[in-house]
């Protein structure tokens, strides 16, 4: 059984480090109880395993369990959820959810009817489930262990309003010393391909449903060809630049199942104005999580 996670710790710009956020790090297994007065709830008792930590997402008081040696989400997941739109009534699926960062951020932003994360690596899926429990969201978010290539067998056809994916960017296993290492699986198409993601998305989206993906610009021609092949019409695209004088290193894409041909190219998104200092637009994206703007 094969597939890949979407949340990852890639060698690229990431969100502020754990030292810059409210972080609880434990070297050994323990039990954590966090009381959040703002949300007037007591979090579930959640066990942390060796090397795991709890990071504050600064979104509705939500937190996430991560292991910096294996699974940490990056800027790509944050920007994808800032780019994506959903409605409260929507049912959402995140393909290759990793430790569950995208369902958590989308729930914080839109309070969707229900969200599901599909993840093949059990260790990541287990962290995602414990993060869901930590935030007392078991009634809103499900984490399913499974293969992206078998997603159309796991879920009913045309059952999701919105599908998100932060897939592996690199083709094949070139240069990998250990293709089974979690970070390698996250970055390279070891267990699933772009076509696997797009073809399963086409089967699982409702007619008129929206697909949101973050990827690398060097594969843009292939991405567009693949989307059109499976009748997912590209509708919106935004290139992401680390600095204003650098080449883009990410592309955000929205496609609609059965949509009419016409695509909007949004203005470029610049991440940093100087080393360690984000552009105002990046902070605006962060504010979206407490000020939802539902899709029409």
Residue map of PLM features:
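Mobile active-site "lid"/loop adjacent to the S-adenosyl-L-methionine
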Residues: 167-196
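Short loop/edge segments at beta-strand edges and connector loops
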Residues: 66, 145-146, 215, 238
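Periodic low-complexity repeat segments enriched in small/acidic residues
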Residues: 1, 6-38
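Class I SAM-dependent transferase core
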Residues: 45-87
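Class I S-adenosyl-L-methionine
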Residues: 233-277
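Conserved small/polar residues in nucleotide/adenosyl-binding loops
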Residues: 289-296
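Conserved SAM/SAH cofactor-binding pocket of Class I
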Residues: 83-165, 170-176
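Conserved Class I SAM-dependent methyltransferase catalytic core
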Residues: 191-241, 248
């Amino acid at each position: 059984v094969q597939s890949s996670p979407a949340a990852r710790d890639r060698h690229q710009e990431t969100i502020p480090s754990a030292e810059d956020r409210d972080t609880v790090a434990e070297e050994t297994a323990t039990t954590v109880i966090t009381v959040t007065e703002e949300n007037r709830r007591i979090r579930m008792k959640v066990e942390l395993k060796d090397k795991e930590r709890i990071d504050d997402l600064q979104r509705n008081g939500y937190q996430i369990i991560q292991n910096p040696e294996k699974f940490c989400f990056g800027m790509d997941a944050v920007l994808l959820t800032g780019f994506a739109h959903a409605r409260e009534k929507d049912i959402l699926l995140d393909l290759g959810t990793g430790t569950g960062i995208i369902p958590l951020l989308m729930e914080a932003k839109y309070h969707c009817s229900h969200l599901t994360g599909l993840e093949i690596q059990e260790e990541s899926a287990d962290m995602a489930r414990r993060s869901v429990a930590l935030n007392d969201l078991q009634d809103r978010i499900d984490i399913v262990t499974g293969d992206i290539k078998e997603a159309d067998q796991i879920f009913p056809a045309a059952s999701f309003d919105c599908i998100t994916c932060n897939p592996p960017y690199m083709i094949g296993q070139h240069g990998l010393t250990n293709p089974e290492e979690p970070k390698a699986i996250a970055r390279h198409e070891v267990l699933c391909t772009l076509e696997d993601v797009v073809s399963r998305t086409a089967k699982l989206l409702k007619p008129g449903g929206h697909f949101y993906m973050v990827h690398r610009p060097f594969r843009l021609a292939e991405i567009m060809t693949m989307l059109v092949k499976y009748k997912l019409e590209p509708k919106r695209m935004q290139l992401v630049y680390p600095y204003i004088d650098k080449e883009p290193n990410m592309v955000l894409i929205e496609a609609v199942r059965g949509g009419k041909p016409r695509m909007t190219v949004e203005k470029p998104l610049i991440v940093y104005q100087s080393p360690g200092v984000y552009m105002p637009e990046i902070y605006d994206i962060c504010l979206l999580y407490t000020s939802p703007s539902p899709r029409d």
